[in-house]
Amino acid sequence: MHGVNDPPLFIKDIKAGLKNLNVVFIVLEIGRVTKTKDGHEVRSCKVADRTGSITISVWDEIGGLIQTGDIIRLTRGYASMWKGCLTLYTGRGGELQKIGEFCMVYSEVPNFSEPNPDYRGQQNRGVQNEQKDKLSTNTFGPVGNGDQTGPESRGYHLPYGRSNGPGPISPQLPGTPSSQTVRTTISNARDPRRAFKR
């Protein structure tokens, strides 16, 4: 759980089921008003921070006060899945406070509220998605469950990218002879036979 005095959570770190969320975001789009059977007005707004975007559902009069470009701090919010999409809510006791306008670094991608067929499939079948495990083999860094594999998980940092010239960087791991190089393979789990042909 997150307390009111905790630093804001990034949108990329929001997961379904989290409560007492503190998030700072900029409003990118305000959806049209829909009315519930009880007579409440609901607006879905697309909001973002520097790590991505998400949809927030805002109820009643507060939704009418929000404008595109507003920078808002949500306190005591929660996240849930609605129609297979991750959605942020203010909830009971939650607050939206305008703290600025327009000047905030943000990214619209990834959109964490895009429909997630994996989640919908899990709900319908009640089983875990095994494809994530298959795709995460032979890779370094975070995998689907947040665990790390490879040298990074043992406290070594492997730089990725290019030095002066083509080819991958060959990092020197502690405890390995200097004449021996370690090749780092970065895989995006795509079949190389289906590569783009020019």
Swiss-Prot record:
Annotated tissue distribution: Ubiquitous with high expression in the thymus.
Superkingdom: Eukaryota
Compartments, record wording: Nucleus
DNA-binding region(s), chain positions: 26-89
GO BP, one annotated term: double-strand break repair via homologous recombination
Residues covered by region (Disordered): 114-198
Residue stretches of biased makeup (Polar residues): 136-151, 173-188
A GO cellular component entry from the record: chromosome, telomeric region
Keywords (A to Z) from UniProt: DNA damage, DNA repair, DNA-binding, Nucleus
Gene Ontology molecular-function annotations: RNA binding; single-stranded DNA binding
Coiled coil: none
Signal sequence annotation: none
Subunit field text: Component of the SOSS complex, composed of SOSS-B (SOSS-B1/NABP2 or SOSS-B2/NABP1), SOSS-A/INTS3 and SOSS-C/INIP. SOSS complexes containing SOSS-B1/NABP2 are more abundant than complexes containing SOSS-B2/NABP1.
Function: Component of the SOSS complex, a multiprotein complex that functions downstream of the MRN complex to promote DNA repair and G2/M checkpoint. In the SOSS complex, acts as a sensor of single-stranded DNA that binds to single-stranded DNA, in particular to polypyrimidines. The SOSS complex associates with DNA lesions and influences diverse endpoints in the cellular DNA damage response including cell-cycle checkpoint activation, recombinational repair and maintenance of genomic stability.
Family, per entry: Belongs to the SOSS-B family. SOSS-B2 subfamily.
Name of protein: SOSS complex subunit B2
Gene name of the record: Nabp1
